[in-house]
Amino acid sequence: MASLKRFQTLVPLDHKQGTLFEIIGEPKLPKWFHVECLEDPKRLYVEPRLLEIMFGKDGEHIPHLESMLHTLIHVNVWGPERRAEIWIFGPPPFRRDVDRMLTDLAHYCRMKLMEIEALEAGVERRRMAAHKAATQPAPVKVREAAPRPASVKVPETATQPAPVKVREAAPQPAPVQEVREAAPQQASVQEEVREAATEQAPVQEVREAATEQAPVQEVSEAATEQAPVQEVNEAATEQASVQAVREAATRPAPGKVRKAATQPAPVQVCQEATQLAPVKVREAATQPASGKVREAATQLAPVKVRKAATQLAPVKVHEAATQPAPGKVSDAATQSASVQVREAATQLSPVEATDTSQLAQVKADEAFAQHTSGEAHQVANGQSPIEVCETATGQHSLDVSRALSQKCPEVFEWETQSCLDGSYVIVQPPRDAWESFIIL
């Protein structure tokens, strides 16, 4: 079987069969070669790819090795899949040494080939990695970085904040309509309050509003006709019960004076700064009382005049505050009108009178109680000083004073003095009555 490839050698040989070889042609044999060396050669099997590494291309290094080692080296390649066969001819000790040397050389070349292959593979991998890095990573990263921020973040910032904020900002000014609607409502409420302030109070509120005009017919009938004791008691107690009158007597004013002293009246805040009590005292100071108030002021009121003489007249608060009443000078100096809260804030209220003045009033009540009936005395003591003042100037004081003056005219004769315009009346008790109070 012929070899696929022949390598260079000093002595060309042809394999006959078994271990029989013959020299081809008539070559020049080296001096160290003997024909007996062709028997029983040494064989070595290696990979065909190692032959070129071991002996060079086409075995160009084999003649040099043969001359140096004094052995013949014959290489036969039977196929690329099969192993190459190396025959070693020479003396037996040389054959063993050359066989060991070629085995080590084959191992070294094998390792060298593996390193070369590994280096080539590494270079190839790096080349492929560099090629991939140059071709694939750039477009992949650009595609991932470009579409994601553009398609995800930009649409959210472009579409979501704009409609949400605009839609929320659009309906927010809607409460302005409510404010505009509330403004005319507040104006209508103020107009109603103004109308309510200008309208006249009903007849039932005559006791509190001394400025309103009462029917002339009732005043004339009350001034001409004599009322029995029961009607007098009912008229005196008609305003409130005895317990309510006693509670009202301990309070400075029928309303909440403390709140009225610090807060404006609920009718008109602007007008409250210039007006007095909610009853319109200024108009009452200039206008005459209802009906026949002037005549009633000049008539005798033996039951309740003793308290009215000691307190300030509710009609003229400014003038009465400076002029003491002849009946009770000490009490009039210490007490103030409960109707006008702001001007009388520095003066003492009727409730804060001294114990001495209260004791004198109680004794005076007991002295007058001997001349009047028990019921009239109880009614006079049950009412508060504010109600006595209102009763002395209002329409009900006409009935009470008229009835009591007709029933017991022999008690005392009082002296009255009225101003030119008839806006207020000064009632002076006689000297005898004043001395009787001092004795008590």
Curated annotation (Swiss-Prot):
Region (Involved in RNA binding): 1-39
GO molecular function, a single term: structural constituent of cytoplasmic lattice
Marked site: Not required for interaction with OOEP: S151
Keyword Transmembrane helix applies: no
Induction or repression: Induced by ultraviolet light, etoposide, doxorubicin, camptothecin and hydroxyl urea in embryonic stem cells. Induced by etoposide and hydroxy urea in neural stem cells.
Organism: Mus musculus
Compartment(s): Cytoplasm; Cytoplasm, Cell cortex; Nucleus; Mitochondrion
GO biological process: actin filament organization; establishment of organelle localization; mitotic spindle assembly; mitotic spindle assembly checkpoint signaling; negative regulation of apoptotic process; positive regulation of dendrite development; positive regulation of double-strand break repair; positive regulation of double-strand break repair via homologous recombination
Gene3D superfamilies: K Homology domain, type 1 (3.30.1370.10)
Annotated transmembrane regions: none
Family to which the UniProt record says this protein belongs: Belongs to the KHDC1 family.
Protein name: KH domain-containing protein 3
Subunit structure: Component of the subcortical maternal complex (SCMC), at least composed of NLRP5, KHDC3, OOEP, and TLE6. Within the complex, interacts with NLRP5, OOEP and TLE6. The SCMC may facilitate translocation of its components between the nuclear and cytoplasmic compartments. Forms a scaffold complex with OOEP/FLOPED, and interacts with BLM and TRIM25 at DNA replication forks. Interacts with PARP1; the interaction is increased following the formation of DNA double-strand breaks. Interacts (via C-terminus) with NUMA1.
Region (Required for interaction with NUMA1 and regulation of apoptosis in response to DNA damage): 341-440
GO cellular component terms listed in the entry, alphabetical order: apical cortex; cell cortex; centrosome; chromosome; cytoplasmic lattice; mitochondrion; nucleus; ooplasm
Domain remarks: Contains 1 atypical KH domain, which is still capable of binding RNA.
